UniProtKB/Swiss-Prot annotation:
The gene is rpsT. This is Small ribosomal subunit protein bS20. HAMAP family: Ribosomal_bS20. One of its GO terms (biological process) is translation. It comes from Ehrlichia ruminantium (strain Gardel). It holds the Pfam family Ribosomal_S20p. SUPFAM superfamilies: Ribosomal protein S20.
Length: 95
């Protein structure tokens, strides 16, 4: 347990930052889940909207140093690949 006042304050600050970081990370994951749900439903407009929001939130997490930039790049790349695959499947069905 911290004895110095500055150490006690830092415990409070760290708890607050941890909650904020968790919230930001959770928000990004929720948009990824919404994207996947839209993919399963076949709703392209909703997919595009959630892809943009997920990408934006992942980049924001990188800027705040919550997740590593390579992790965000990998997740965005995989989402983009799923979006592209969905588009190609829709074009094949239309043809």
């Amino acid at each position: 347990m911290a004895n110095h006042p500055s150490a006690k304050k830092m415990i409070k600050v760290i708890k607050k930052r941890t909650m904020i970081n968790r919230m930001r990370k959770s928000r990004a994951h929720n948009y990824i889940k919404k994207f996947m749900a839209a993919l399963a439903a076949g709703n392209k407009e909703l997919m595009l909207e959630n892809f943009k929001k997920a990408e934006s939130n992942l980049h924001r997490c990188v800027n705040k140093k919550i997740i590593h930039r390579n992790t965000a790049a990998r997740k965005i790349s995989r989402l983009a690949l799923k979006l592209k695959t969905f588009d190609l499947q829709q074009q094949e069905k239309a043809s």
